[in-house]
A protein has these predicted regions:
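C-terminal motif of bacterial Sec signal peptides marking the signal peptidase cleavage site
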Residues: 18-21
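Predominantly soluble domains enriched in secretory-pathway, periplasmic, or organellar proteins
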Residues: 12, 23-375
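Bacterial N-terminal signal peptides that target proteins for export
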Residues: 1-9
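Short, ordered beta-strand-loop transition motifs
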Residues: 5, 272, 286, 427-428, ...
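A domain-level signal for the mature, folded cores of soluble proteins
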Residues: 376-450
C-alpha cells in the first residue's frame, strides 16, 4: 500500500502536512504524448522553443528525434542543469550551433548542436549596464544580427561569439530578416503604446556592408513579423495601434524600388514557402483563429481555410515551414498558462502528427537534417526530484469573489465541484498556474511518496 503526502497550503503562508493511506490515488506522471505518425522527409530532429511565462524564468527548449520518436521537453535544462532564462522569443540553427534569444534575461544563448551544451551566454547589455532586451535573430555570411527593444541591432561573429558592432534603428524593433545584402528591421514602438508617442510604423533598411541605416520605410502601425519573400521582396505583418483590436495588415516591400504595398489580409503571424504564404490571425474578442494559404505572386487566396480535416487550433502561437519536407508546423498555446502542443500538417492541410504538452507557449520551431549526439532522455530533466510534484487535488477553495485572472482558475461555467477538482488536478499535473483567488483561498494537494 502506498503512502501519500497531502499538503494544505493557504494564502496566510501557513500549512499543515497530513499523512494518509489510500489505494485509489494512482500516480499520473506528466507525459508529452504523440498522436499520429511522426515521420518526415530528410529530417532527423526538430527543436521547439517555449517562451514560458513573463517574469517566471521558465523558458524551455524541447527536442524531438524522428529516429527514435523521443521527446525531451526541457532538453537544454536536462543537458546543462540550468534553465534558459526569462521569456525566450526566437531561435535558429546556423552552422553547428543553436542560437536562442531570451528577451527579459537579455541574453543570446549559444548551444553546441552536437551535444546540447551551452557554448556561451552572450549578455546583451548597453554601456550603462541596462538590458537591451533582444527580440529576434537573422544570419548572413558567418554573422548573426540581433535586433533589440532598445532600438539597436547587434552584429555577432559566429566563430568568436563576440559582439562586433552595434547600430541604431527605430523604436522597439520586433523582427529582422535579410534580403539583397540588406537587413530589414520592423520598428514596432510597442513599448510606447500607452504613451503620447504611440507606436512606430516603419521598417529600417540597414546596408550590411556599412552596417548603417540607409532608409526608413513607412509600412503601417506596429510592424512585427518580417520575412524575406521571393523575387527580392520582404513581407511584414502590421498589428495596428492596439493588438487586441485586430487591425492587422499584410504588407509587401519591393526591395528593388522600396515600394510599399498594403493588402486587406488580416495577418498576425505568417510563414513563407516559395511563392506560398501561410497566414494566421487570432481574434481576441471571439477567441477564434483562422489560417489561410495565400499566393504571393498572384496575390490571391489559395484556400481560405488551410486546415481541411477539421483539426481545431484554438490559440496559434507560432508557425514555421520544414525546409526539408515543406510541411507546415503550427504551435497551439491553449490558454497561455498550460503546456501547449506542436501540430504538423501536410500542404493539403491534413494533420500528420501532434506532439502534445511540448511546453509553455511554444513559439518557434527549427529543423535539422542531422541528428545530435546527446542521448539524454525525457526523464533526465527531473531526476533530482522525481517525487517532488503534486499529482492530485483533493480540495480547491479559492477566496470568494476575488477572481481577477480567470484563465488560471479551475472554475468554468457549468462545472460541478467534481469537474473543478478534475480541472485543478490537470493543471497541477501539467505544472501550470492555478489561482487561489486572493487572501483566504486554499488548496489541498496530494503528493506521491513511497
Amino acid at each position: 500500500m502506498k503512502r501519500k503526502l497531502i499538503y494544505i497550503f493557504s494564502c496566510w503562508l501557513s500549512f499543515l502536512i497530513l499523512f494518509v493511506a489510500c489505494d485509489d490515488m494512482e500516480d499520473k506522471p506528466f507525459t508529452s504524448g504523440i498522436i499520429g505518425d511522426p515521420t518526415e522527409t530528410g529530417t532527423a530532429e526538430l527543436y521547439v522553443l517555449c517562451e514560458g511565462l513573463f517574469n517566471q524564468n521558465n523558458s524551455s527548449l524541447a527536442r524531438f528525434s524522428f529516429g527514435n520518436q523521443q521527446i525531451v521537453r526541457d532538453y537544454f535544462k536536462a543537458v546543462n542543469r540550468r534553465g534558459l532564462g526569462d521569456t525566450a522569443n526566437d531561435m535558429a540553427i546556423y552552422g553547428s550551433k543553436i542560437y536562442v534569444i531570451v528577451n527579459i534575461s537579455s541574453t543570446v544563448e549559444v548551444i553546441d548542436f552536437r551535444t546540447g551544451s551551452s557554448l556561451k551566454q552572450i549578455q546583451m547589455l548597453a554601456e550603462n549596464g541596462s538590458s537591451r532586451q533582444p527580440r529576434y535573430i537573422a544570419f548572413h555570411k558567418e554573422k548573426a544580427y540581433v535586433c533589440s527593444y532598445d532600438g539597436t541591432v547587434a552584429r555577432i561573429d559566429t566563430t568568436s561569439l563576440s559582439i562586433e558592432a552595434i547600430t541604431s534603428v527605430g523604436r522597439n524593433p520586433d523582427g529582422i530578416c535579410v534580403q539583397n545584402e540588406k537587413l530589414y528591421i520592423s520598428n514596432s514602438g510597442g513599448l510606447d503604446y500607452s504613451s503620447g508617442l504611440g507606436v512606430d510604423n516603419t521598417v529600417s533598411v540597414v546596408d550590411i556592408a556599412t552596417f548603417k541605416e540607409s532608409s526608413k520605410l513607412t509600412v503601417g502601425p506596429n510592424p512585427g513579423k518580417i520575412v524575406a519573400g521571393p523575387d527580392e521582396t520582404v513581407y511584414v505583418a502590421t498589428r495596428g495601434e492596439d493588438v487586441e483590436a485586430g487591425d492587422y495588415n499584410f504588407v509587401k516591400i519591393d526591395c528593388r524600388t522600396n515600394k510599399v504595398t498594403q493588402s486587406n489580409e488580416k495577418v498576425q503571424n505568417f510563414a513563407i514557402d516559395g511563392e506560398i504564404a501561410y497566414l494566421y490571425n487570432y481574434n481576441y474578442n471571439t477567441q477564434t483563429s483562422s489560417i489561410k494559404m495565400f499566393n504571393l505572386k498572384t496575390e490571391e487566396t489559395i484556400r481560405e481555410n488551410f486546415i481541411t480535416d477539421g483539426t481545431v487550433i484554438k490559440t496559434p502561437y507560432g508557425i514555421n515551414i520544414n525546409p526539408y519536407s515543406n510541411n507546415v508546423y503550427i504551435t497551439e498555446a491553449r490558454d497561455y498558462t498550460t503546456y501547449g502542443d506542436l501540430l504538423c500538417f501536410n500542404q493539403q492541410g491534413q494533420l500528420m502528427f501532434r506532439l502534445n504538452n511540448i511546453g509553455l507557449n511554444p513559439n518557434t520551431i527549427a529543423f535539422s537534417d542531422k541528428a545530435s549526439q546527446s542521448d539524454i532522455d525525457d526523464n533526465d530533466d527531473d531526476k533530482e526530484n522525481p517525487l517532488a510534484f503534486a499529482n492530485k487535488v483533493w480540495e480547491y477553495r479559492p477566496a470568494p469573489g476575488q477572481f481577477i485572472n480567470t484563465t488560471t482558475s479551475a472554475y468554468k461555467e457549468g462545472f460541478t465541484y467534481d469537474d473543478i477538482l478534475e480541472e485543478a488536478t490537470r493543471r497541477i499535473q501539467q505544472k501550470s498556474l492555478l489561482t487561489l483567488g486572493g487572501f483566504g483561498g486554499y488548496i489541498v494537494l496530494g503528493f506521491p511518496q513511497s
